[in-house]
């Protein structure tokens, strides 16, 4: 891996430690030892794909070890849909879109707060 990251001059490296895109059935089993081993041999910023649904304590552990970017698109999309559905009874498209955007804003803020430990 050291040869690879040096040879291709990567900007960031997405690591597979038991994470997966989409939603998890139950608590995910992340391999923090593998994450630490990767961190120990590279200075490249590490990315966690499939961050949606990973509990906060596991996110914090991943950040402590070296994760610098966390992808949570599934949760963001779900927030948008739920927001739109919550405003759908009135049938006003613009109210639905506004509710979806507000839900995305709230979800994004909660994730930023989690990632920054606020």
Predicted segments with their positions:
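A conserved C-terminal secondary-structure "cap"
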Residues: 81, 98-102
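Short beta-alpha connecting loops at secondary-structure transitions
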Residues: 89-98
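Glycine- and other small-residue-rich loops at beta-strand/loop junctions that grip anionic moieties
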Residues: 24-27, 48-51, 73, 100
